[in-house]
């Protein structure tokens, strides 16, 4: 299980994980690592939260928010943001399903993808700033937001089909069992309720999961299934929705 955790951390993030820690693990086994997603999100969000706390007293809330969101993007190598941009380029092209999937595979950034990146990044910076001004404990808020975003992505894997013939997303989409889904969501909810006061954690998780479930159904109807790009989009939007629900 420890090998699987390190493999998933190396897969999702750009944190330096020695290859020997996950040596001998077959790529097809990665679907079992979905239960690690909330904890990996917790680590990435925790690092982002620490950066915010360290910079807040030195450069103020707005710049601290800017740098912690930038750090979060760098920690994942822009992996999820790239998925968000590709998804928006395809969906908002208003073409046939096959053409949408072709556009999503194009490495060039389109207008809709660029606008989506600007909107999501700017929204995160503004929401983090507002939460900090309201006295929200930012280490916990950012850590749980990332755990919620990563955990909620399982809703686009369970009982969904892969919209393409091959790709990274095929490792997870349609390969996750009901038990794994329940464990993943349960762990995300536990993290939220433990780290956030009162019923706030549970309430924000319910809002986030409901929104991502609806997103998954809309993408399924539009694309005929899910892709690795739509998983990245779900994680980014899940984080933003969770932070918005904290306001």
UniProtKB/Swiss-Prot annotation:
Transmembrane segments: 34-54, 59-79, 113-133, 138-158, 171-191, 194-214
Pfam families for this protein: CobS (PF02654)
Cofactor(s) this protein cannot do without: Mg(2+)
GO molecular function, a single term: cobalamin 5'-phosphate synthase activity
Enzyme class: transferase
Subcellular localization: Cell inner membrane
InterPro entries given in the database record: CobS
Enzyme Commission numbers on file: 2.7.8.26
UniProt keywords, alphabetically: Cell inner membrane, Cell membrane, Cobalamin biosynthesis, Magnesium, Membrane, Transferase, Transmembrane, Transmembrane helix
GO-annotated biological processes: cobalamin biosynthetic process
Coiled coil: none
The reaction(s) this protein catalyses: alpha-ribazole + adenosylcob(III)inamide-GDP = adenosylcob(III)alamin + GMP + H(+); alpha-ribazole 5'-phosphate + adenosylcob(III)inamide-GDP = adenosylcob(III)alamin 5'-phosphate + GMP + H(+)
Entry superkingdom: Bacteria
Pathway(s) of this molecule: Cofactor biosynthesis; adenosylcobalamin biosynthesis; adenosylcobalamin from cob(II)yrinate a,c-diamide: step 7/7
Chief localisation class: membrane
Topology class, membrane: Multi-pass membrane protein
Family to which this protein belongs: Belongs to the CobS family.
Role of this protein: Joins adenosylcobinamide-GDP and alpha-ribazole to generate adenosylcobalamin (Ado-cobalamin). Also synthesizes adenosylcobalamin 5'-phosphate from adenosylcobinamide-GDP and alpha-ribazole 5'-phosphate.
Protein name: Adenosylcobinamide-GDP ribazoletransferase
Lineage of the species this protein comes from: Bacteria, Pseudomonadati, Pseudomonadota, Gammaproteobacteria, Enterobacterales
């Amino acid at each position: 299980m420890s090998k699987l955790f390190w493999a998933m951390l190396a897969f999702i993030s750009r944190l330096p994980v020695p290859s020997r820690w996950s040596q001998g693990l077959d790529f097809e086994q990665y679907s079992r690592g979905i239960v690690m997603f909330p904890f990996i999100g917790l680590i990435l969000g925790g690092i982002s939260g620490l950066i915010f706390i360290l910079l807040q007293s030195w450069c103020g809330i707005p710049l601290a928010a800017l740098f912690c969101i930038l750090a979060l993007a760098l920690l994942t190598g822009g992996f999820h943001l790239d998925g968000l941009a590709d998804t928006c380029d395809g969906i908002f092209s208003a073409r046939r399903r096959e053409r949408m999937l072709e556009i999503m595979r194009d490495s060039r950034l389109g207008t809709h993808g660029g606008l989506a990146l600007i909107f999501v990044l700017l929204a995160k910076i503004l929401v983090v700033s507002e939460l900090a001004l309201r006295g929200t404990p930012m280490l916990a808020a950012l850590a749980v937001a990332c755990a919620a975003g990563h955990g909620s992505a399982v809703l686009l894997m369970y009982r969904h089909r892969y919209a393409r013939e091959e790709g990274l997303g095929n490792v997870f989409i349609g390969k996750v069992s009901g038990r794994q889904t329940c464990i993943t969501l349960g762990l995300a909810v536990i993290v939220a309720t433990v780290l956030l006061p009162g019923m706030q954690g549970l309430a924000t998780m319910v809002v986030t999961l409901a929104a991502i479930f609806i997103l998954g159904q809309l993408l399924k109807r539009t694309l005929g299934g899910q892709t690795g790009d739509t998983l990245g989009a779900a994680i980014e939007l899940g984080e933003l929705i969770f932070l918005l629900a904290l306001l």
